[in-house]
């Protein structure tokens, strides 16, 4: 797509009559607002995800020179990264090859000494080893320390003794490698990501009088994620003023790195907030522009597993169609007696906030600057009251559901439980002027 645009631009530049059109096309491609790709490129077809919703990267490597040699140079990491079935097959073949190699060695030593001849010598190198199968069984018993007591090595042949010593050393090294690789693979925090979840959608709404992009993260386990922190990047195609086409330009999305709010205490689900300011790549996007935009928001959660102290990383992504403008997340944290309760039924649910501005954050800032000398606040008080009452109603509905479940489960209630538990309602995030 970018190559075709570059060829069209180049052909237009070579034709004298189309020089002005080529300049206009180049200016439109390179100097479009906020660096977005032109409308025909972004509007014809949505590009595939770079990072899937489950965190897997949608990338395939091709034409790698010397790929096998590079993987074998770091054999331990290769064994840890491969699937279990290939790992088990590799280790089984390694043990089998070791037994066959030393069995063949013992058979050759016995054959050269004459132990396999029709009249066996009075002092053989190996007792009860008269064939290749017997030599293979002797190698197996030696490396695994089975010790049936039938076959053994004698002091007649120093070469046989040296071969037995060499097999013991090689067997110890192979066992250590196999045990280390299996333990490292079992201790990988990859499966820990299954209990770290992101919300299905992200939302764009006002918070503290600023337009913010928000999404939720949650931990389904009781064990904590130590030193948990979040990051986000915006991936989008871009054409530089020089005409270079970048298929995926990575832009950092600030989630509070300077203030330290990117480091989270993930005991209950937390809403990650990105304030859309002048440094944000979404600063010039309103609701209409967002629907036509072509980008991918990649969100990352990192931390150390409490049980193993190994670092884990959980990833997900959001497309423009998954950013809900003018929505907020439903409350998930409620107080039940002396404990707090997290209801994951509401984790992915959102509700619409009427009156949310549909313009971009840039236009909001311009309007706020124009109305800065006005004594009245431009933010309606009825909207703030609705937001608070809406979240309060959600908490009350949660209380009613709990009360109905309690009444159905028990015929009589104690006086302590007669009073309905008080829900932990979110505090009003918007302070209205008097």
Swiss-Prot record:
Activity control, per UniProt: Channel activity is regulated by variations of cytosolic pH; channels are activated by alkaline and inhibited by acidic pH values. Inhibited by Ba(2+) and Cs(+) in a voltage-dependent manner; sensitivity to those inhibitors is lower than in other Kir channels.
Organism this protein belongs to: Rattus norvegicus (Rat)
Biased composition (Low complexity): 418-434
Protein name: ATP-sensitive inward rectifier potassium channel 14
Tissues expressed in: Expressed predominantly in motoneurons of cranial nerve motor nuclei within the general somatic and special visceral motor cell column.
Chain intervals for the UniProt region annotation (Disordered): 398-434
Annotated intramembrane regions: 132-148
Membership in a protein family: Belongs to the inward rectifier-type potassium channel (TC 1.A.2.1) family. KCNJ14 subfamily.
Catalytic reaction equation(s): K(+)(in) = K(+)(out)
Principal location: membrane
Location of this chain's protein in the cell: Membrane
Function statement: Inward rectifier potassium channels are characterized by a greater tendency to allow potassium to flow into the cell rather than out of it. Their voltage dependence is regulated by the concentration of extracellular potassium; as external potassium is raised, the voltage range of the channel opening shifts to more positive voltages.
Cytoplasmic side: 1-81, 186-434
GO cellular component assignments: dendrite; monoatomic ion channel complex; neuronal cell body; plasma membrane
Membrane topology per record: Multi-pass membrane protein
GO biological processes: potassium ion import across plasma membrane; regulation of monoatomic ion transmembrane transport
Gene Ontology terms for molecular function: inward rectifier potassium channel activity
Residues passing through the membrane, by range: 82-108, 158-185
Chain location of the short sequence motif Selectivity filter per the record: 145-150
């Amino acid at each position: 797509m970018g190559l075709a645009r570059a060829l069209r631009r180049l052909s237009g530049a070579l034709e004298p009559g189309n020089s002005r059109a080529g300049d206009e096309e180049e200016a439109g491609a390179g100097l479009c607002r906020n660096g977005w790709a032109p409308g025909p490129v972004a509007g014809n077809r949505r590009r595939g995800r770079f990072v899937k919703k489950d965190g897997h990267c949608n990338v395939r490597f091709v034409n790698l020179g010397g790929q096998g040699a590079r993987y074998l140079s770091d054999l331990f990491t290769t064994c840890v990264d491969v699937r279990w079935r290939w790992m088990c097959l590799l280790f089984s073949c390694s043990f089998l090859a070791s037994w066959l190699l030393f069995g063949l060695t013992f058979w050759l030593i016995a054959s050269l000494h004459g132990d396999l001849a029709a009249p066996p010598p009075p002092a053989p190198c190996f007792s009860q080893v008269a064939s290749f199968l017997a030599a293979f069984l002797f190698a197996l018993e030696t490396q695994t320390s089975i010790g049936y007591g039938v076959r053994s090595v004698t002091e007649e042949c120093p070469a046989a003794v040296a071969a037995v010593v060499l097999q013991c050393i090689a067997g110890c090294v192979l066992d250590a490698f196999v045990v280390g690789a299996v333990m490292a693979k079992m201790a990988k925090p990859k499966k820990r990501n299954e209990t770290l979840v992101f919300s299905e959608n992200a939302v764009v709404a006002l918070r503290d009088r600023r337009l913010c992009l928000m999404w939720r993260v949650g931990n389904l386990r009781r064990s904590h994620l130590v030193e948990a922190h979040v990051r986000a990047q915006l991936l989008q195609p871009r054409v530089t003023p020089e005409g270079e086409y970048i298929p995926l330009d990575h832009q950092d999305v600030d989630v509070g790195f300077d203030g330290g709010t990117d480091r989270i205490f993930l005991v209950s689900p937390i809403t990650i907030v990105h304030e859309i300011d002048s440094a944000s790549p979404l600063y010039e996007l309103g609701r209409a522009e967002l629907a036509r935009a072509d980008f991918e928001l990649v969100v990352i959660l990192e931390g150390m597993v409490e049980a193993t102290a190994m670092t884990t990383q959980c990833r997900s992504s959001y497309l423009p169609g998954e950013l809900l403008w003018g929505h907020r997340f439903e409350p998930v944290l409620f107080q039940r007696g002396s404990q707090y309760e997290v209801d994951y039924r509401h984790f992915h649910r959102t509700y619409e906030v009427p009156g949310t501005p549909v313009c971009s954050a840039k236009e909001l800032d311009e309007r706020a600057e124009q109305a800065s000398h006005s004594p009245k606040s431009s933010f309606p008080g009825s909207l703030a009251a609705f937001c608070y009452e809406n979240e309060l109603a959600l908490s009350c509905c949660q209380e009613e559901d709990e009360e109905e479940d309690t009444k159905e489960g028990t015929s009589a209630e104690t006086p302590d439980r007669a009073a309905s538990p008080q829900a932990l309602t979110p505090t009003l995030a918007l302070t209205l002027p008097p």
